[in-house]
Amino acid sequence: MAVALWYCPPANSPCYDTVNSLILSLQTLFPDAVLFEPHVTITSQLRCDSADDAAAVLAAACAALRACRPQLDARGSPVVRFDAVAVGRRYFDKVHLACAHDRFLYGVAQVIRELFVQDPPDPAAAADWVHSSFRPHLSLVYSDLYHVDQALLRVLRQRIGDALGAALLPHPPAPGLQALWALQPPLDGWSIPGSFKVVRCEGPVRDWHVLAAADL
């Protein structure tokens, strides 16, 4: 993962407080769970070797999202919305909120991927990555627990549904997932304001650190 770009809800906002409280409440269910800041990863593998590189990533991300603001305001829904809760089989997506498809969010990811991951910049490769590999989500639990038993799934479904004030409706899980529940109603996340952060994600999660941040 090395260096990643996160998009975070505004600190002390209702979305931040709700999700952060949920992350805390789920810690007790997984013996190896660790704490982390609520975020959606826009992309990882950034070419970022200096403070100037980090500043350039932030400037591009902010510019890309600000350019969408009139259209976001006109439609009245945020760029980050959640339509499902999933239990995955991998450490970083063990329990997560899946983002609804949003062309503005995907557009920001494509811009950053093209400019700061592809070397040299390659619009076609960035577009292919967005359509084939980009699965934006907000993690609630990181854990190496491979199989989540039915009793724990029931507790997760109840606790997450209560925290979000939504029904979790079972759906057939996609490959790589153990369980999938549709959120009814879908949950609004955030748009602008928000905070982009360039984060060095090396070693244990407790050792990750923010290299630079910019608020929108």
Curated annotation (Swiss-Prot):
One of its GO terms (biological process) is cyclic nucleotide metabolic process. SUPFAM superfamilies: LigT-like. Keywords: Golgi apparatus, Hydrolase. It comes from the Eukaryota. It is an enzyme of class 3 (hydrolase). GO terms for cellular component: Golgi apparatus. PANTHER family: 2',3'-CYCLIC-NUCLEOTIDE 3'-PHOSPHODIESTERASE (PTHR28141:SF1). Belongs to the 2H phosphoesterase superfamily. CPD1 family. It is found in: Golgi apparatus. It catalyses: a nucleoside 2',3'-cyclic phosphate + H2O = a nucleoside 2'-phosphate + H(+). Pfam families: CPDase. Substrate binds at residues 41, 139, 142. This is 2',3'-cyclic-nucleotide 3'-phosphodiesterase. It comes from Eremothecium gossypii (strain ATCC 10895 / CBS 109.51 / FGSC 9923 / NRRL Y-1056) (Yeast). The active site is at 39 (proton donor/acceptor), 137 (proton donor/acceptor). The lineage of its organism: Eukaryota, Fungi, Dikarya, Ascomycota, Saccharomycotina. Its EC number is 3.1.4.37.
